[in-house]
Structure formats: structure tokens, C-alpha cells
């Protein structure tokens, strides 16, 4: 069963970094004001929340300057051949990449 948007939004407050929480809330408002569908909002928020959890308490989105920081997160989505013989993980990897790029290029750059 897919996660509802309200459930995803409630997870923002429990992130380990308050700066990232605030940026994700602003990103959500940005998507709403641009008329994004709830499904699009939900999927983007889930990806960005997962990345924020990966960054932990000491790193904010504003501190992310190297592509290697994003790549190390994306590489957690890679599965070995025994787990995923059809290499379906590539779709997940690309989906997260697209959503994180959207977050950084479409929204965060305007904030900086």
C-alpha cells in the first residue's frame, strides 16, 4: 500500500537535522504552489527525506557541494546480481537521482 502524502509530511519533523527539515518543508510549499500533483509531491518528498536521513545530523543540504556526496547515497540503492538478477535497481537509482536533481536545481539554488 503506498504511503499517503500526509504520512510522508509527518516524517519531515523527525529528521535528524532541523535545517534540512525546514528546507524540505519549503520544497513542499514550492511544489504545491507550482501545482504539482499529490503523487509527485509525495514521491519527491520520500526521496529527499531518504537523502536527508542518509546525510544525518551534521550535514545540511546546503553543505552538499560534491557529486560524490549524492553518489554515495545513490549507491546504497545498488543490489548485487543474486538479489536483483534483472538489475531493476537501476530504475530505482535513476528515480532517486532525478528527484534529488529536481530538489537541488529547481528549488535549493534559488534559496542560495
What are these regions (language model features)?
Residues 1-5:
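Intrinsically disordered, low-complexity and often Lys/Arg-enriched segments
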Residues 6-13, 20:
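Charged interaction scaffolds used for protein-protein
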Residues 7-10, 25-112:
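N-terminal core-binding DNA-recognition domain of tyrosine recombinases/integrases
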Amino acid at each position: 500500500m503506498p504511503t499517503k502524502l500526509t504520512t510522508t509530511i509527518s516524517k519531515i519533523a523527525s529528521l535528524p537535522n532541523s535545517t534540512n527539515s525546514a528546507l524540505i518543508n519549503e520544497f513542499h510549499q514550492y511544489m504545491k504552489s507550482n501545482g504539482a500533483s499529490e503523487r509527485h509531491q509525495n514521491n519527491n518528498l520520500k526521496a529527499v527525506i531518504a537523502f536527508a536521513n542518509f546525510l544525518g545530523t551534521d550535514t545540511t543540504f546546503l553543505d552538499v557541494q560534491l557529486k560524490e556526496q549524492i553518489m554515495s547515497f545513490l549507491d546504497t540503492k545498488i543490489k548485487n546480481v543474486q538479489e536483483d538478477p534483472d538489475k531493476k535497481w537501476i530504475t530505482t537509482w535513476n528515480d532517486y537521482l532525478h528527484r534529488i536533481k529536481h530538489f537541488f536545481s529547481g528549488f535549493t539554488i534559488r534559496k542560495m
